[in-house]
């Protein structure tokens, strides 16, 4: 089970741009936009999750991931999701609760042909129902990650 910690990895600067996951073989943390001092919460961990992805994120953070029960305001949610895991809309709505206004949810699913694969259309359909907007996706080894954010009009209102 993941343990709570604050990400405090010192970023380096090269040519004016921040290097987040310096020279990690797959640069998973960089692809996910993980930055120092972010609070990152993990949902849906199971035996099949990719330890390389988790390690890259933890390396970039300088610590371990927060679990689902944290009371902290979260910058990034890493949601491992597989076909048969339940209702994605309900889980996304639960994950939004502690999410910062400008926070990001990454829905990480097995790639096509892998057990538990989820169609990207299912994520795209669930997102607006949960009050989120899909923005992009990245490949992470045998997993694919879809980036979801709160619409600016909703997030900007206080």
From Swiss-Prot:
Family matches, as InterPro entries: DUF3052 (IPR021412)
Domain of life: Bacteria
Protein name in UniProt: Uncharacterized protein Mb2263c
């Amino acid at each position: 089970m993941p343990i709570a910690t604050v990400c405090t990895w010192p970023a380096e600067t090269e040519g004016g741009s921040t290097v987040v996951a310096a020279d990690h073989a797959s640069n998973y943390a960089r692809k996910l936009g993980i930055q120092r001092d972010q609070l990152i919460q993990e949902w849906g961990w199971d035996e099949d999750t990719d330890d390389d992805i988790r390690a890259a994120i933890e390396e970039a953070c300088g610590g371990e991931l927060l679990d689902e029960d944290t009371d902290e305001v979260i910058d990034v949610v890493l949601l491992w999701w597989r076909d048969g895991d339940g209702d994605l809309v309900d889980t996304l709505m639960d994950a939004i609760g502690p999410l910062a206004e400008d926070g990001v949810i990454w829905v990480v699913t097995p790639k096509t042909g892998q057990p538990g694969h989820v169609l990207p259309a299912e994520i795209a359909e669930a997102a607006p129902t949960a009050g989120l907007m899909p923005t992009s996706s990245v490949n992470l080894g045998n997993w694919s990650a879809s980036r979801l954010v709160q619409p600016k009009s909703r997030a900007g209102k206080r």
